[in-house]
Amino acid sequence: MSKEQTLMTPYLQFDRNQWAALRDSVPMTLTEGEIARLKGINEDLSLEEVAEIYLPLSRLLNFYISSNLRRQAVLEQFLGTNGQRIPYIISIAGSVAVGKSTTARVLQALLSRWPEHRRVELITTDGFLHPNQVLKDRGLMKKKGFPESYDMHRLVKFVSDLKSGVPNVTAPVYSHLIYDVIPDGDKTVAQPDILILEGLNVLQSGMDYPHDPHHVFVSDFVDFSIYVDAPEDLLQTWYINRFLKFREGAFTDPDSYFHNYAKLSKDEAINTAASLWKEINWLNLKQNILPTRERASLIMTKSANHAVEQVRLRK
């Protein structure tokens, strides 16, 4: 970090080696087998990546969480109350195919294994998409993931209830197999110590929803936000490669919403994936996701093979 660079940006910038050095003496608590189970269908997640990127991040988060708990204790002492358990909320945003889910799962595993043994829940905002029938009725099936495709009132109420100390809060669950919210498939979240909220839209604010104005937003309740970033050419490549793997795997299931794609030749599949990327996911990235990047507390930038090459931490 040059002095001039540090002064001109709201972020502290670290290359991979600088960030890895901040691990200090935090022990590795995951085995190679566990790491293999955490990674996404299209990602290379190594022991080295966890040690050099995610362990320093978990150390930083542990400091923030401990500080937050001390602040809560001070408030309780001042008020003379025994406070409710209020979860620390971490949000993870970024493009489709960038690896948000893997980042979320790795952090969940690491944070739950700190000596404090905190309980960590993971929720994706996919569950808060409107059901397919609603999207069809509104002509929004090709806008899945865009702001107007979400039940934002329900998502905001979910995080608001958690931050208000409500003992049991329910979240809808999304199935990528049927490409829809699971009817009556709600998951109950019971006052975890930490909630990781992962999704395309978790950094968006009211200005991103002019069609559906309300005064509070998800980002108002988030304690620490992460944006997983990568160059657009890599994102497109990862999206297409993931589509090809799904074509040979999940799409072959007769119950899959995309079962017809399993019958495509490789060239047809590549062309289909490229079209889906350009017409839907790239458009959403440019219009609604990328503009929220600089709202994040921390930005992780990936290079080839999903390896993080740079970390920017808000001062």
UniProtKB/Swiss-Prot annotation:
Residues binding ATP, per UniProt: 94-101
Keyword list, A-Z: ATP-binding, Coenzyme A biosynthesis, Cytoplasm, Kinase, Nucleotide-binding, Transferase
MF (Gene Ontology): ATP binding; pantothenate kinase activity
Biological process according to GO: coenzyme A biosynthetic process
Top enzyme class: transferase
Reaction catalysed by this enzyme: (R)-pantothenate + ATP = (R)-4'-phosphopantothenate + ADP + H(+)
Record pathway: Cofactor biosynthesis; coenzyme A biosynthesis; CoA from (R)-pantothenate: step 1/5
InterPro entries linked to this entry: P-loop_NTPase, PanK, PRK/URK
Recorded superkingdom: Bacteria
The EC number(s) this enzyme carries: 2.7.1.33
GO cellular component terms attached to this protein's record: cytoplasm
Compartmental location: Cytoplasm
Family, similarity comment: Belongs to the prokaryotic pantothenate kinase family.
Family matches, as HAMAP family: Pantothen_kinase_1
Protein name: Pantothenate kinase
Gene: coaA
